[in-house]
Amino acid sequence: MPVHIRSSSIALFVCTISLASSVGGQQPPQNWTHFVRIGAYGLSPSNSEKIVRDATTTHVFGIEVDNDIPGRYESFLDPTEKLAAIKAVAEKAHQAGNKAFVYIAGTECITANAEKAPHSVVKDHPDWLQRKITGEPAVFTGGAAFWIREGDEDVWISPYAQPWRKQYMERVRQIAATGIDGIYVDIPYWMTHFDGWEDSWASFDEYTLAAFKQKTNLDARKDLKLGDFSDPNFRKWIDFRISTFTEFLREIRDNARSINSSIMVIPEIYPGIEEEVVRVGADVYQLYGVVDAVAHEYEFGGGDHMAGSRSQLDWFLYQVGLASFRAFAEGKATWLLNYSWDGDKNVDAREAMKTLAASEVMAGVNFWDAPGHSMAGSNDAATRIEIFRWIERYQNALYHARTPFHPVGVYFSPASRNYDAAHFLPSFRGTVLLLLQSHRETQIVTPRTLASFNGTALILPDVSQLSTIERDELKAFMDRGGRLFITGSDVTKFPDSPTIARSASSLGSNHLSRLEKDFMKASQSLQLELLASLPPDSGLRIEASPYVVSYVAKVDGKPHFYLSNFAGIVPHQNVRPTPESATRIVVTASPNATLTFVPFLGTEQTLHGEHSGDQLIFHLPPFDRGAVAWLNDSK
């Protein structure tokens, strides 16, 4: 029998995108990146018209074209032919009322048939290469990754190799001059993600060593205890490596915008909120501040990451990641290149596509459909058209700016994640999961948004690192009536106060541990001590199964509700959720208020509420994957 949770609020997932505008700030205006329905295509000198025609027919808006200039050494040296193709597809896209963006690699560069080629990076510029501390260069060939062919030379270049960087930025400016709408920068990484390089903490090439020496007066080969997160000098190495790619992306955008003031720069990044960020050196929290949107090829942990292979807990953990990305974005767009199906005979690819899409769009994230682990094409073209048509019809409800009501905040501390991931991450994820499953309105708060957070309570889940600025902003939050809930680690140094509640135990970690042991049992017996002590909110709540994730936000002046359902999912067997049939929305509203209800891939239904005092209770029709609803004529 389904378990339903009564709550005084709703897990608010996406409202954080508009936090800056809710208190004293201005949210960036929306643009085409907020409304993309992405399809990808290989670009040649002769197929731009065909690409745009197919995109139009299949309801693609936001055409990705793969025509990498700096990531292929031949075109890095001479980009003439590829630049002409990019210009052609941009013109065709604009004629059709569409937008196009072009793929380029970050620090990876491939030379085809390198042994026979007169030039390659290794032959011409071996000093450019990233290196292990032993001096081993980051050079690979076929088999190192699925996109590298036999005989190809695959290298990873130091972003501090100034001759390369100067030419790279020239290529960026040339691409911007074609009129293309966006530059999609893939894999701007330190080489730590191929076999044998996971613990390298690269790079120790001469260019990088010199830059670190200039910044810190430290010799990275001698003055660090690699892998020791308690070592202050290693922490400087962590910060240096992350800031390197933040500034690299900033420079790409500055160069592109110097030629085309409206061009968008969108990096593709696979690390999300987890410890992989620290190894790879690409931190989406930092990157959102210097680019126009982020495309997340988001995955964590082991496994194949396909929608059809995810457990219920996996789906919920992905939701925590997406919630975090929307908080980091502060009004910018979040794209997601996740994968639905790759040949699993026990899973219907169409069902996997639909469940994946629903889980993303309800979170305010733009859906990118792709087959297997590739970027272009689809596992089922007809299903993609069905999904894209529905998204297009309801794009305003899905993607217009969302603002919060009265959320409980959960603090995401990048420094705690960077230096103490083993304690912070389980606590953070578990806390958010508990709130999501209990249908409390929740907002992820970051150092950039702490000063403007206007919720009633803020939870610090095993936050082990706080700057002076953060402490001052926490004090200001309490001074304006907010309550602080500190669980696990406590480095605030605040004296006891009626506005502070402390728990020595890590409530979030405990909840996550219970879910990992037995997801169903833990979900049906949520430990609600933390929730009982949180301030109640008023006027708005959702009652639903703990297998449903619910978000609420004000969109275009109306309360909107977003529901994602993961009941009944079994990895490699069933990816279509069991319908949820007992969800209720309870609101304080005028007697004549109605609720518009739209199930995923369905059409609008008008619901009338049941009166209970000054409240209306709306009983939602059954839905399987998800639904969006909004209140009309509320007071």
Question: Could you describe each region identified by the protein language model?
Answer:
Residues 34-40, 63-65, 100-103, 183-185, ...:
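Hydrophobic faces of well-ordered beta-strands that scaffold small-molecule active sites
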Residues 134-319, 324:
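Polysaccharide-binding and catalytic clefts of secreted carbohydrate-active enzymes
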